[in-house]
A protein has these predicted regions:
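Metal-dependent phosphodiesterase/phospholipase catalytic core, i.e.
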Residues: 1-87, 103-116, 130, 140
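C-terminal active-site rim and adjoining tail of enzyme catalytic domains
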Residues: 10-13, 85-176
């Protein structure tokens, strides 16, 4: 059954929701795609990536340790871009980052932290420079020290600007 999109008032529109396969075919060779939460369905997603020839355009993310990622995805890591999500408020955050860099060389990390009281995000701007890229998620205020979408709408420099200029973000996940 085909699904229809709804507008901002939750009214059904004539526009259809594409299947993942249709979206992958359309995006082939054009853009990178972050398949959020797709790690839960990795086998099915991987089959579609192979079928559509888009394995090198997909970013899969997760918050597992390097050991668990290697165990779960193994040889797939040679074809699919895997980006670790690291909660900087956890005690072992720096060790987790270094483990991934040493063993997997990820192109980027999604870094999470609740408040600017945490000194680690500022330190990582310099320590990760030239080694990997930094990605921040700005959907909620607890994911990037309150430098989220809402803060950015009020004052760019306190939101996205802070993440880019002060914390070295090269990628920002937003829904605005």
């Amino acid at each position: 059954a085909k699904l229809n999109l709804k507008n901002g008032c939750a009214i059904r529109t004539i526009h259809k929701v594409p299947t993942l396969e249709e979206a992958l075919v359309h995006a082939k060779g054009k853009i990178m795609i972050n398949l959020d939460k797709a790690d839960r369905y990795f086998e099915e997603v991987y089959a579609l990536l192979k079928k559509t020839g888009t394995t090198n355009q997909i970013i899969m993310k997760g918050n597992k340790s390097y050991e668990k990622v290697k165990e779960q995805y193994g040889d797939y890591l040679k074809e699919v871009i895997y980006m670790p999500i690291v909660n900087l408020d956890k005690e072992n955050a720096e060790e987790q980052i270094e483990s991934f860099i040493k063993d997997m060389h990820p192109v980027a990390f999604e870094l999470l932290y609740k408040t600017d009281e945490n000194p680690l995000p500022r330190r990582l701007k310099d320590s990760l420079k030239g080694r990997t890229l930094i990605w921040y998620n700005t959907l909620w205020d607890t994911m990037a020290g309150a430098h989220d979408d809402d803060a950015s709408l009020q004052d760019f420099d306190k939101g996205y600007g802070y993440l880019i200029d002060v914390l070295g973000a090269r990628m920002i996940q937003t829904d605005r």
